[in-house]
Amino acid sequence: MPASISRSTYASMFGPTTGDRLRLGDTELVIEVERDLTTYGEEVKFGGGKVIRDGMGQSQRTRAEGAMDTVITNALIVDWTGIYKADVGLRDGRIAKIGKAGNPDTQPGVDIVIGPGTEIIAGEGRILTAGGMDAHIHFICPQQIEDSLHSGITTMLGGGTGPAHGTLATTCTPGPWHIGRMLQAADAFPINLAFAGKGNASLPAGLEEQVRAGASCLKLHEDWGTTPAAIDCCLSVADRMDVQVMIHTDTLNESGFVENTLAAIGGRTIHAFHTEGAGGGHAPDIIKVVGAANVIPSSTNPTMPYTANTVEEHLDMLMVCHHLDRSIPEDVAFAESRIRKETIAAEDILHDMGAFSVISSDSQAMGRVGEVITRTWQTAHKMKVQRGRLAEETGANDNQRVRRYIAKYTINPAIAHGLSRHIGSVEEGKRADLVLWQPAFFGAKPDLVLLGGMIVCAQMGDPNGSIPAQPYYSRPMFGAFGGALHASAVTFVSQAAEEDGVGERLRLQKGTLAVQGTRDIGKADMKLNAHRPSIEVNPETYEVRADGELLTCQPLAELPLAQRYFLY
């Protein structure tokens, strides 16, 4: 006879199931399990007296006969594709199957085989997400990588060579020599990396050599001169060589206004950085480009969300990041032209509408590399508090809003940069770059981070304890060391560099993967974030209107996922 147990008892044993709801951290966001791919009464769980034992939930099948390398049991997947419960099977560093795990010789409906060679990660009561992608990195110091990884980011894309002044201001790794050195340096780090070449040139040869050297994308930055000629040249090279172009437009409007920049872009695909404008771009109306079909608009996290301290801290940050001098009036005016509370407030709302598609950091150059994920969920919380439930929500949950916001740092930057065949979502065939969270710590402190199917960092207690005793904090694990590091992480390069054998030429120890499909995409390809409102900015008051509606909200004085989570 089947046994019946209460929902609370079931959830404590196997995690929440269809119809159960849970809160994300200390936010006002509540998710509901949409479906459950496991089978009631046939759930697998590891431990003393539990199911995954020889002849029970564990079969006799070898790896050659289809047994998984690792199975994550009973995980609650939170992804742009949905919010659902499943077992997840990993093989060869990728997601092999999402479904029902167990022993097909003793259990019905098993499509994920557990064998003697299978490791188990207990996902009961935990949330599983794709590893995050930060697509706006100034590689100013290598220590950024540790902070980023331990926050749940598994892929970093950007440019730089260290604390050189070009890197402090712009996300470019200029020239074949520097690109080669950064590709070699990437071998040391347990994270996926990709590098941007400098895109500011009026003739193509200097850009083409950077793409052939291994640049996965090109960056146009106003500090190097983002003129119409440079924009056109860079995009022409990108179209021929299939790499993405990121743009930081002309704050001073020296070589044209936002309309001139859009004309120079000419309908070609481009990723617009910090599209609100505080991070740089045509003042005061760069935010207009969120309505363009060919522009992928993104935010950097210092303005996300709009709080009581946002405006005050920005002026000092900007003076430092762009090598400005307070004694020069023109430098001060340049800085002040970029900080507008009206456009910063509108940015939150445009994210909630799905008009901004991506959130990234702008690491150490007005952004915080370890806070991309936290600030994304703080913004989602703020918008629920201030705007209420989304009209498209069904049921007593925030699933649609949660799916929209998680897409901003997972699938959408991956699509924008030609990486979505490999990363960006919890889907079969993609790399097993995954993050497990305790729901109470969701968005603040990951429990486990997997890279290529191996644990690279985790919350861990005293190594000298008889058990892993408190205090717990995130520490590097075995996947972050030795040859395992090189087998788990990859470096993304251009197709031209991959075909030229860049890995062998530079004797890289990490594998390389080519970016692909960056030019025939646009705003419509941004998952759950493809809205294209018509934006108008009042040049005197800076008020922002979308399709005629005034966009304004108040700054928050207190946020979730903040001080109470970071005592140590």
Curated annotation (Swiss-Prot):
Location(s), subcellular: Cytoplasm
EC numbers for this chain: 3.5.1.5
UniProt-annotated binding residues for substrate: H221
Disulfide bond keyword on record: no
Pfam family name, one: Urease_alpha
Modification after translation: Carboxylation allows a single lysine to coordinate two nickel ions.
Domain Urease: 131-568
GO CC terms, sorted: cytoplasm
Top-rank taxon: Bacteria
Listed pathway(s): Nitrogen metabolism; urea degradation; CO(2) and NH(3) from urea (urease route): step 1/1
Residues that bear N6-carboxylysine: K219
Main location class: cytoplasm
Active site, UniProt feature: H322 (proton donor)
Chain residues that bind Ni(2+) 1: H136, H138, K219, D362
Record's catalysed reaction(s): urea + 2 H2O + H(+) = hydrogencarbonate + 2 NH4(+)
Alphabetized InterPro entries for the sequence: Amidohydro-rel, Metal-dep_hydrolase_composite, Metal_Hydrolase, Urease_alpha_N_dom, Urease_alpha_subunit, Urease_AS, Urease_asu, Urease_asu_c
Entry binding sites for Ni(2+) 2: K219, H248, H274
Keywords: Cytoplasm, Hydrolase, Metal-binding, Nickel
Subunit structure, as described in the record: Heterotrimer of UreA (gamma), UreB (beta) and UreC (alpha) subunits. Three heterotrimers associate to form the active enzyme.
Similarity section: Belongs to the metallo-dependent hydrolases superfamily. Urease alpha subunit family.
NCBIfam families recorded: PRK13206.1, PRK13207.1, urease_alph
Stated name of the protein: Urease subunit alpha
Organism: Cereibacter sphaeroides (strain ATCC 17023 / DSM 158 / JCM 6121 / CCUG 31486 / LMG 2827 / NBRC 12203 / NCIMB 8253 / ATH 2.4.1.) (Rhodobacter sphaeroides)
Lineage: Bacteria, Pseudomonadati, Pseudomonadota, Alphaproteobacteria, Rhodobacterales
